Curated annotation (Swiss-Prot):
The protein's Enzyme Commission number: 3.1.-.-
Region (HEPN domain), start-end ranges: 147-386
Protein name: CRISPR system endoribonuclease Csm6'
Region annotated CARF domain, chain positions: 1-146
Length: 386
C-alpha cells in the first residue's frame, strides 16, 4: 500500500488556482492511505482537505487517517519539539510492507525543516517529496484561499486535469548526506582523531581538495600506527633524530588531546628516557656503558638516569625531570595493572607534559611553530574541507 504522511499548512488544499503541496502530491502518487497531521490553526480545514482529496479523480477515494493529538499552535514554530513529534509520528505509522511518501512542503518552516532532517537521518525507507510553486519562485506575496468556497476552488483549480504540470521534486538525500559526512570528518579532525576522519572521507564522493586531504591524513594515520615521522615533519629543516624526537612528543600531545590519558602516561617515560640517554651520551661518552657494566643491566630506567645526572652534577636537569619521576609511580600503576586513574594522577600528567615540553625544547631548540605542527595541519585540512 502507498501511504502519504502530511502535515497540513496554509497553502492546503489550494492556493492561487493551483494545488497546495498536499493535494499535488496526492494527485501525482495517488496514495491509498493519507495520514493527515493538523495543528490547532489548520484543524478547521479538515472538511475542505477531505473534499479536495476526493476531487482528484472520480474513483479516487483514499483512506484518511486524522492523527491524534492535534499539534498545539504554541509548538509548531519550535524546531526541536517538531523534530521529536514528527519522528515519533513516522515511527508510529511506518511499516516495511508499505511504501511511504513524506510531504516536505506543507506547514510551518520549523515543521518542514524537521521533516527535511528526519528524512535524511532516520535510516528508514521513505520517499520524501517537495513541491515547487506554480511560478517556480517564492509565493510569499500570494494570498491564501482559506476563506473561499471549497467547491468553487475545486472547480477553478488549474491542476485539476489529466495532463497537469507535475511540480513534485523527489528529495534525494545524497547531497545532504555528503555534507553531513564532511561535517563529521571535520569534527574528527578538530579532535585529532585522524583515523576516524579518514574512514569518513573514504565514503565521500569526489570534490575539489578531497584527494589531497585524504593523502595528508592517510600519511599521518600510517605514521602514527608505525611510530614513524609524518611527511610534514620530514620536510622541516631538522636532523633525522630531531624529527623523531619531535614526532614522538607530538604523538603524546595527540593522545592527551584525544583523552587517551593512559597512553600518554606510558609514552612520557619512554621519551624522557630516550632524551636523557641522548643527552648523557653526547656530553659524557662511555658513561652509560660503564654504568651498565657496573650494575649488570642492559636497560636503564628513569631512576637510573636520575642517578647519572646526580653523579655528573647535572642538578638543573635533574630538577627539571623531577615531575616526570614523580609521575612514574602512577605510570607504572597504569602500565602493569587494571587500576583506574585518579584525579591526582591526571593532574600529574598535566605537570609532566609541561615538563616534557620544556625538556624537549631546551635540548633540541624547537620553535613554537614546530610544536604547533598538528594544529597548523588541522587549519589547512579544515580550510580544504570548507
Amino acid at each position: 500500500m502507498r501511504v502519504l504522511i502530511s502535515a497540513v499548512g496554509d497553502t492546503d488544499p489550494f492556493r492561487n488556482f493551483h494545488d497546495g503541496s498536499l493535494i499535488h502530491i496526492a494527485r501525482k502518487y495517488r496514495p491509498e492511505k493519507v495520514i493527515l497531521i493538523f495543528s490547532e490553526h489548520t484543524a478547521k480545514k479538515q472538511g475542505n482537505i477531505e473534499k479536495a482529496l476526493f476531487s482528484i479523480a472520480p474513483n479516487y477515494e483514499p483512506e484518511l487517517i486524522i492523527h491524534d493529538p492535534i499539534i498545539s499552535d504554541n509548538e509548531v514554530h519550535i524546531f526541536d519539539v517538531m523534530f521529536q513529534r514528527f519522528s515519533d509520528i513516522l515511527q508510529e505509522y511506518y511499516t516495511k510492507e508499505d511504501e511511504f511518501i513524506l510531504n516536505l512542503s506543507s506547514a510551518t518552516p520549523q515543521i518542514k525543516s524537521a521533516l527535511f532532517v528526519i528524512n535524511r537521518l532516520n535510516g528508514i525507507n521513505v520517499k520524501a517529496v517537495q513541491v515547487s510553486s506554480p511560478e517556480h519562485a517564492s509565493n510569499e506575496n500570494i494570498g491564501h484561499d482559506n476563506d473561499e468556497n471549497i467547491d468553487e476552488l475545486i472547480e477553478v483549480n488549474k491542476d485539476n486535469k489529466v495532463n497537469f504540470i507535475d511540480r513534485t521534486i523527489e528529495d534525494n538525500a545524497e547531497k545532504f548526506s555528503q555534507a553531513l559526512l564532511k561535517k563529521t570528518a571535520r569534527d574528527f579532525i578538530e579532535k585529532f582523531d585522524y583515523k576516524a576522519a579518514l574512514d569518513i572521507l573514504d565514503q565521500l564522493s569526489d570534490f575539489p581538495n578531497l584527494k589531497s586531504v585524504r593523502e595528508e591524513i592517510r600519511d599521518v594515520v600510517n605514521c602514527l600506527s608505525k611510530q614513524d615521522v609524518p611527511k610534514g615533519l620530514r620536510h622541516k629543516k631538522l636532523k633525522e633524530e630531531e624529527q623523531k624526537i619531535l614526532s614522538a612528543y607530538l604523538t603524546i600531545e595527540l593522545q592527551r588531546e584525544r583523552g587517551n590519558v593512559s597512553e600518554s602516561f606510558i609514552r612520557i617515560k619512554n621519551l624522557t628516557e630516550f632524551i636523557l640517554e641522548d643527552y648523557i651520551e653526547k656530553r659524557y661518552p662511555g658513561l652509560i656503558d660503564e654504568y651498565c657494566e657496573d650494575i649488570q643491566k642492559y636497560y636503564l630506567s628513569l631512576f637510573d638516569y636520575s642517578k647519572l645526572l646526580k653523579a655528573t652534577k647535572e642538578f638543573k636537569l635533574k630538577r627539571t625531570i623531577a615531575p616526570i619521576i614523580d609521575m612514574n609511580s602512577s605510570r607504572n600503576k597504569v602500565a602493569h595493572s587494571l587500576s583506574p586513574l585518579d584525579s591526582d594522577a591526571v593532574k600529574q600528567l598535566g605537570i609532566a607534559m609541561k615538563t616534557l615540553k620544556t625538556l624537549v625544547r631546551e635540548q633540541y631548540h624547537f620553535s613554537q611553530s614546530d610544536f604547533n605542527f598538528y594544529h597548523d595541519l588541522n587549519k589547512i585540512l579544515l580550510t580544504k574541507l570548507n
